[in-house]
From Swiss-Prot:
Compositionally skewed regions (Low complexity) per UniProt: 103-119
UniProt protein name: Protein FAM133B
Region of interest (Disordered), residue spans: 19-38, 69-245
Gene from which the chain derives: Fam133b
Record PTM Phosphoserine, positions in chain: 82, 190-191, 193, 195
Highest rank taxon of the organism: Eukaryota
InterPro entries: Fam133
Length: 245
């Protein structure tokens, strides 16, 4: 049995393309583009001049548009100017009205100022007359005022004494309260100490009772052992007496 031949023939693509020959192109080639017909310099100049001149129809259209635009601008300007004039007139009217109102207010304020000044002068005169009357009454009542001053001083002294007494009484009360608080604070401590001593006594009693119980249990155990031993002795004696005859 021989091996199968898996080899494949190698085909050179470049050689295959050469053997096929030149490809038929459907469109224009590069050479056709390079060999295209070109205009002369004179023809180019003529075209540029035509572009600069432009068409007559376009020029007429542009002129009409410019005229219409100019008319619209003029109308808009007229409207704005008329609006500005009307606003300026309104402002002038307002200013005039303000001036008139200011004149009326100034006249009214001047009248009010004059009336207020007259009222102020009258009030000052009244105050001066009152002061004079007070001075005269003070001169006449000077001895009475001295007596009243002495009475007021004595009253003030008695009030001060009362205040000092009240303060001392309050201090005493506060001290007594503080002492009572201390006593109440110390009392629970003493009760605690008493409770501790009571606890010690209770524990000692418990220990004693426990010891007594242990003693009683020991005694009972000894008695039981003694009874058992005596019973055994009696049994032995009975058995020995029965065996002897």
């Amino acid at each position: 049995m021989g091996k199968r031949d898996n080899r494949v023939a190698y085909m050179n693509p470049i050689a295959m393309a050469r053997s096929r020959g030149p490809i038929q192109s459907s469109g224009p080639t590069i050479q056709d583009y390079l060999n295209r017909p070109r205009p002369t310099w004179e023809e180019v100049k003529e075209q540029l001049e035509k572009k600069k001149k432009g068409s007559k129809a376009l020029a007429e259209f542009e002129e009409k548009m410019n005229e219409n635009w100019k008319k619209e601008l003029e109308k808009h300007r007229e409207k704005l100017l008329s609006g500005n004039e009307s606003s300026s007139k309104k402002r002038q009217k307002k200013k005039k009205e303000k001036k008139k109102s200011g004149r009326y207010s100034s006249s009214s304020s001047s009248s009010s100022d004059s009336s207020s000044s007259s009222s102020d002068s009258e009030e000052e005169d009244k105050k001066q007359t009152k002061r004079r009357k007070k001075k005269k009454s003070h001169c006449h009542k000077s001895p009475e005022t001295s007596v009243s001053d002495s009475d007021s001083d004595s009253k003030d002294g008695s009030k001060k004494k009362k205040k000092s007494k009240d303060i001392t009484e309050r201090e005493k009360d506060t001290k007594g309260l503080s002492k009572k608080r201390k006593m109440y604070e110390d009392k629970p401590l003493s009760s605690e100490s008493l409770s501790e001593s009571d606890c010690g006594e209770v524990q000692a009693k418990k220990k004693k009772s426990g010891e007594e119980r242990e003693r009683t249990t020991d005694k009972a155990k000894k008695r039981r052992k003694h009874k058992k031993h005596s019973k055994k002795k009696k049994k032995k004696a009975a058995s020995s007496s029965s065996d002897s005859p």
